A protein has these predicted regions:
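Feature activates predominantly on carbohydrate-active enzymes
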Residues: 1-179, 195, 228, 232, ...
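Soluble non-cytosolic domains of exported or imported proteins
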Residues: 32-36, 93, 97, 158, ...
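Flexible loop/turn segments at secondary-structure boundaries
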Residues: 32-34, 60-66, 120-126, 181, ...
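Residues at alpha-helix termini
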Residues: 47, 108, 235-236, 275, ...
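Short glycine/serine/threonine/alanine-rich loop segments
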Residues: 50, 111, 238-239, 278
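Acidic-residue sensor for enzyme active/binding pockets
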Residues: 116-118, 186, 363
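Active-site neighborhood of glycoside hydrolase catalytic domains
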Residues: 126-132, 136, 141-257, 262-277
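Flexible, acidic glycine-rich loops studded with aromatic residues
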Residues: 241-247, 251-399
Length: 399
């Protein structure tokens, strides 16, 4: 130090995170994120001690990860027509070599890369080239709009287990993360009607001892599908499965990680996690859906009527949810912000939607509740945003 004003006092710091994982999920399916732009997202995350990036690689609109056993997935199902006003490509996929490079690069920043393969719903891209994955075996086109498709994988069809087994074999070799996300969301009624009318699914119900043909019992078929995938991931690849929590799917295997995402239903998800000795990732929409606008009318050209999640809404997230010390020690896994890409159409928009809400999420996941205050956060955030501006990082000023 040149003088006393430049000196740093001798001190000792003791610090540790409140939650094990502080994650951002990105969705290159609806709008493809070119590899170099995806890679550039990681250093900014690491600045704020966000330590996991969750890649939503499969959905109705595209299949984005190379699977060498099934080359048609990327040759044919990585292109989507429609939504022509998007400024980013709607064609593209990531090679396994790129993903290995991403894993290595992220590790330098202490960020792990977690892949997600959706099932049994949100699989139209795969079904478009392999219709034998369904109950009906009829080819359907890739979905070109938002929303939820009624198309599902057929749990009574042994081919889907062969298919998924081969997919996970390659993923396990590419991604060293101990976690793989299996999706599981929005495979509800009336989509489950296809299982009711499927001879293979009805034969499986009989084999499982399910005597009723009631549609509500079809959830047990999803449970069977997940049980087989959990066994595969745990026993063969030593991976911990993750899921999007759904109230109708009440069976959660101990040790799995379930994501509480539906707005207003977090308490039910927490209760299910505790009862099943599972762990939970908090990403409730009212706090953590970063694809939602931060202010009413923000970017109306791409906002299809989503609710508003303000910066303060994100900061209000209490990862402990008032559940007590036992819950935090035994069940709380982490917090996650989600960047679904129906309305994210440029690289700048990714940052705009993520920041500064990701700063609030990072603090919620790191600091104990007693050490947090909205006023203090704002004071610390403003010079951080000035630094981001100097470095050319886009962020929202709607706070």
């Amino acid at each position: 130090a040149k003088n006393c004003c430049d000196a740093i006092p001798l001190l000792s710091l003791s610090d540790q995170p409140r939650t094990h994982v502080r994650e951002l999920m990105v969705d290159p399916c609806r709008t493809f994120i070119p590899y170099e732009q995806l890679k550039a997202f990681i250093p900014e995350m690491a600045r704020y001690k966000l330590n996991a990036i969750h890649l939503h690689l499969v959905d109705d609109q595209a299949w984005r990860i190379e699977i060498k056993k099934y080359p048609r997935l990327t040759a044919e199902a990585s292109s989507r027509w429609g939504m022509d006003d998007m400024n980013m490509p709607i064609k593209g996929y990531y090679t396994q070599e790129q993903m290995r490079d991403l894993v290595s690069y992220a590790a330098k920043y202490h960020v792990q890369v977690v892949p997600e393969i959706e099932m049994p719903g949100h699989e139209v891209a795969a079904i478009s080239v392999y219709p034998e994955l369904t109950c009906h075996g009829v080819q359907v086109p890739i979905r070109t709009t938002c929303g939820v498709s009624d198309e599902l994988l057929c749990p009574g069809n042994e081919f889907i287990y062969e298919f998924l087994g081969n997919v996970f074999k390659e993923l396990a070799d590419v991604f060293p993360s101990p976690y793989i996300h299996l999706g599981g969301d929005e495979a509800g009624n009336p989509a489950l009607d296809c299982w009711t009318n499927c001879p293979k699914c009805q034969a499986l119900k009989k084999k499982l001892g399910i005597t009723t043909t009631d549609r509500s019992e079809n959830w047990k078929l999803q449970g069977y599908l997940f049980d087989r995938m959990i066994e595969l991931l745990r026993n063969r690849y030593h991976k911990t499965p993750m899921f999007w929590y759904e109230l109708d799917f009440k069976k959660i295997q101990p040790g799995c990680v379930t994501f509480a995402w539906r707005s207003g239903l977090t308490e039910e998800a927490l209760k299910a996690a505790v009862e099943n000795n599972a762990r939970i990732m908090l990403c409730p929409g009212e706090h953590c859906y970063f694809d939602y606008p931060m202010a009413k009318g923000d970017m109306p050209e791409v906002n299809w009527g989503m609710p508003v999640t303000t910066l303060k809404d994100t900061y209000r997230l209490d990862p402990g949810w008032g559940m007590g010390e036992d819950f935090e020690n035994n069940n709380l896994f982490g917090v996650a912000g989600t960047l679904w890409s129906e309305c994210i159409n440029t690289p700048e928009r990714i940052y705009y939607q993520a920041y500064p809400r990701a700063l609030a999420l990072a603090e919620a996941g790191w600091s104990m509740q007693k050490n947090r205050s909205w006023e203090g956060f704002i004071l610390r955030m403003e010079p951080t945003l000035e630094d981001m501006m100097r470095r050319g990082i886009t962020f929202s000023m709607e706070y």
